[in-house]
Regions:
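N-terminal structural module
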Residues: 27-81
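Flexible glycine-rich active-site/ligand-binding loops centered on an Asp-His dyad
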Residues: 162-189
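Mid-length scaffold segments of soluble, non-membrane domains
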Residues: 72-150
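Sec/Tat signal peptide C-region and signal peptidase I cleavage site
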Residues: 22-26
């Protein structure tokens, strides 16, 4: 394993030195969290589009990765892509579910208009019930937010399914805009998820 990492770093160094670029889809590490270059959601292979770090003030809160069927570099392309999608979040510090939920709602409100918020209100309330089941998100906890076409949004915590499916794609896209919208919760995370870093 160590030899493989050394070889990957050596190859990356050679590629940088010679002006070559790493492939668009490659596994990366963010703050000690490894994001695989591909995952399977609803029987479809998704590739890592980008990954980055969510910070608040000076604290590293979580590492997040976005998985899509093919590379997308603009927000409209990400939001209109067909097929499954995944956001993977790994906590880097302990956060109460109240604090995480509040940040989630602020991000949602900042990046949706009143009509959208009204449309997705029932699903937003369901999602709130999911957070009510969790006292604390601990360092190392992994949350997955999957969009499964024809079914809906499914949330997992450490591999365990949480809550019911939320069927409207508008809800999933509103969740994505927490990180990719005009007022993202972390301005440096947005370009990272779009693969710009």
């Amino acid at each position: 394993m160590r030899r493989r990492q050394l070889l990957q770093r050596l190859m990356a160094g050679v590629m940088l030195a010679t002006g070559l670029h790493l492939p668009a889809f490659a596994s990366i590490e963010v703050a000690g969290v490894k994001f695989d270059d591909s995952v399977t959601v609803a029987g479809k292979e998704l590739k890592l589009n980008g990954a980055g770090l969510r910070t608040k003030v000076i604290f590293k809160v979580y590492a997040a990765g976005l998985y899509l069927a093919e590379k997308k570099t603009t927000v409209p392309d990400v939001l209109t892509t067909s097929g499954p999608r995944r956001v993977s979040i790994t906590m880097l510090r302990e956060v109460s579910s109240d604090e995480f939920g509040k940040s989630f709602m602020e991000g949602l409100s900042s990046n949706t208009d009143k009509v959208e918020r009204t449309r997705i209100l029932p699903q937003t309330m369901k999602f709130g019930e999911v957070f009510a089941q969790i006292q604390t998100l601990k360092k190392g906890d992994q949350m997955l937010l999957d969009w499964i076409p024809g079914e809906g949004t499914q949330c997992y915590l450490n591999g365990k399914k949480l809550g019911d499916l939320m069927p409207d794609v508008a809800f999933y896209n509103a969740v994505l805009r927490i990180w990719l919208g005009d007022k993202p919760v972390d301005s440096s995370l947005k370009p990272a998820l779009l693969g710009e870093r």
